[in-house]
Amino acid sequence: MPAASPSVRRPEARRATAHFVQAALRELAADVAAGTEVPFALDTRGRYGGPALYEYRPLYRAFVEARMDRLVRLPDYDTAISSLGGDPAVLGVARDHAPDADTDEIALRSAVLVPLVVGVAEGAGGFDFDDRVFDGIFDRMLSDVAQTRRSFTGFAPVVGLRAVDGVHDLGQDIHARRITPAELAEAWPECQGLLPERYGLARDRLLALELDVALPRVDDVELPDTARRFARAVLALRIVFGGPITVGPVLFERVDWAPRAVRALPASVTQNLPGEPARLDPQRLYLVRALADRMADAEVHGGPIAVALSRWATASGATVSAERAAGLAASVEPLLGADGAGHHAVAMRAAALVGANAADREDIAIAMRSALRLARPDAPITDTEQLARVVGDVARSVLAAALDHGADASQLGAMLDAVLLGSRPRPQSVTNLVRSA
């Protein structure tokens, strides 16, 4: 015999929730009949380089949530909550989907009842109850209950990065791929105001970071820190490819394909940066993955790498080129000047690490010394925009080398002194890859 559908297996819950949804839709329809309008969003459509097209999308969720204080007073509300709350499996899914809920009642309301009312309204195109639409949503929810594992997904739009079509593995369960505003709007209709300007239209605004993991359905499982993982990925992309790569300003999370939360991202990876968009080279993604893993280790153990990364991320967003150049040069001091050797030693060590030949090393040393002197009141006037670009490339190379050395990064200064003395060769692989970006 074919397996019974989920709604057949839980007929009491289905009946109680259907009665509440019907009552809620009648209440909402009465508001519309009285002249209240459903708010709407204009979703952007089109292709980069072409005109923007707009699609009208009613925001049923906002309309429903604004009236929940009335809907919870409907007689069928308590019956639905009692029926759903009596099922431990349903209650567990509700807690997963509404992690910030203070009570089980709020979790069931946010994760089950509101999505049902909103889903039926969206599926029916208004506030008429449709059995088929209701059953489809209710059965999908109960299918989640039957699963022994749950899917956890996070999205965040990327700016300042171009790539060929495909899915690009950035490590730590994160991928970069093209995603349209329409795809995001399917789960988050209100997302249009939370996306970067011209997202989905400009060539460097077509990608998103996506975290997708399967987790056991148990109460004490630790959910991924999506914001921190995305921040590592963006910083690793910036180090390897350069360019004004940013993400956010917010990320979108969902569990089992149902919206879970919209969260803020760290300012260090959301602030606008100067420069031309970078191009993702799939051949260098192995380095992005390696650097992101080393950043995770640095977050745990701290030390000079963590300090240097924090300074570099902050300095990269400086709007004044002189401040940016000085900050980028100072960001590598915890790595190259931890022994207190001074600015000259930091500049020489950076040149020894990054310079490809004698002339290149001389230029780097001069640039680093100039940038480190910018904080002084008697600093000479220079082309600080060009200086910031040169020092920025040097800082990226130093950070890549330090992360590549891992726990030995504290000895980077001593190692480079040996390079300057000619007693050991210059490490080349990582710094060459980063500088040629």
Q: What does each model-identified segment do?
A:
Residues 2-89, 93-96, 101-111, 124-140, ...:
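Amphipathic alpha-helical interface elements
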Residues 1-19, 420-437:
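Actinobacteria-biased recognition of intrinsically disordered, low-complexity terminal regions
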Residues 78-323, 405-437:
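Charged, non-catalytic interaction/linker regions at domain boundaries
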Residues 230-234, 332, 391-399:
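Short amphipathic C-terminal alpha-helix that caps PH/PH-like domains
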Residues 336-340, 372-380, 396-407:
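Charged/polar positions within long, soluble alpha-helices
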Residues 358-392:
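Histidine-centered, metal-coordinating catalytic motifs and their short helical/loop contexts
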